[in-house]
């Protein structure tokens, strides 16, 4: 199906969805799209739901996409997976585009890959402010060249200000611009007992990019000031085994973990 804000279910609020399998789904359109749900909120539970297919949300307006869910505002997503190639402008995740502070993701996986034109692309989640545990991503993550905004691209999550524990990323990251990492592009939260295996390729011409095997930028903005104020990101018991291949060596940052 295609159009604006397209998913199988639209807004899921204080509801339970279990044991749904979507095979070879093809979703195209503008604004916010995914295979299963547009937004999950309230005391909702999404459990044992799985999807395969393609999602394409490239548009000047919106362009947010998730392999299974676009927004997890609150509630839980447990034991779900997506083998969906996900393409969009911003907030692009192989499983979920954006997880807000009251969202919980456990025992989930994504393998289809996530590709953005502007910012915040991750193999599992594009942007995370909630809690993610025991979850894994194995798809390739990439960000195309874009003249206005280009940052935060990670093998597991693009931008993190939440909590991530016991997670892994295995796909390569190909990027232009700032904050590319094998696991996380920009970390302003807490990441513990997690690892990544993929290589990071930074194609940025000239100074201005930042790339590293695990975390592209940890708790600091491009000017080096702490963000949020006096609350740097934390990395505990994390490691990376991949290589970092950069066009300009000035863009290599110091968070290989």
Where does each model-flagged region fall?
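Predominantly extracellular beta-rich ligand-binding scaffolds that present long acidic/polar faces
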Residues: 1-257
């Amino acid at each position: 199906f295609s159009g604006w804000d397209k998913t199988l279910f639209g807004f899921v609020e204080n509801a339970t969805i279990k044991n749904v399998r979507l095979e070879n789904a093809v979703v195209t359109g503008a604004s916010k799209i995914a295979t299963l749900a547009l937004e999950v909120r309230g005391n909702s539970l999404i459990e044992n739901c799985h999807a395969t297919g393609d999602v394409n949300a490239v548009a000047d307006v919106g362009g947010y996409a998730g392999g299974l869910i676009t927004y997890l505002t609150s509630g839980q997503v447990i034991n779900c997976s997506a083998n969906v190639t996900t393409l969009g402008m911003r907030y692009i995740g192989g499983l979920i585009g954006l997880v807000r502070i009251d969202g919980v993701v456990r025992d989930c996986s994504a393998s289809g890959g996530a590709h953005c034109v502007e910012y915040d692309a991750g193999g599992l989640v594009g942007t995370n402010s909630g809690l993610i545990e025991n979850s894994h991503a194995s798809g390739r993550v990439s960000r195309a060249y874009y003249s206005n905004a280009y940052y935060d691209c990670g093998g597991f999550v693009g931008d993190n200000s939440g909590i991530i524990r016991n997670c892994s990323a295995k796909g390569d990251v190909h990027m232009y611009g700032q904050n590319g990492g094998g696991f996380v592009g920009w970390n302003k939260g807490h990441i513990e007992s997690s690892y990544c295996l993929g290589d990071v390729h930074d194609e940025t011409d000239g100074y201005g990019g930042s790339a590293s095997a695990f975390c592209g930028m940890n708790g600091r903005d491009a000017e080096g000031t702490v963000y949020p104020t006096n609350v740097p990101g934390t990395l505990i018991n994390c490691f990376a085994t991949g290589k970092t291949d950069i066009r300009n060596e000035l863009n290599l940052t110091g968070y290989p973990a």
